[in-house]
Amino acid sequence: MNVQFTVNGRAASIDVPPNTLLVQ
């Protein structure tokens, strides 16, 4: 699962299972 979102104004790209979207 490839998810692309913005963190602290930065573009972050992660490839993880849906249950690990809790990234801090």
UniProtKB/Swiss-Prot annotation:
What GO terms are given for molecular function? 2 iron, 2 sulfur cluster binding; aldehyde dehydrogenase (quinone) activity; metal ion binding
**Keywords carried by this UniProt record:** 2Fe-2S, Iron, Iron-sulfur, Metal-binding, Oxidoreductase
Query: Which coenzyme or cofactor does it need?
Result: [2Fe-2S] cluster
Name the Enzyme Commission number(s) assigned to this protein: 1.2.5.2
Known catalytic reactions: an aldehyde + a quinone + H2O = a quinol + a carboxylate + H(+)
Report the co-factor binding details. Binds 2 [2Fe-2S] clusters per subunit.
Per UniProt, the enzyme's principal EC class comes to oxidoreductase
Subunit record text: Heterotrimer composed of an alpha, a beta and a gamma chain.
Name of the protein in question: Aldehyde dehydrogenase gamma chain
| Source organism (scientific name) | Comamonas testosteroni
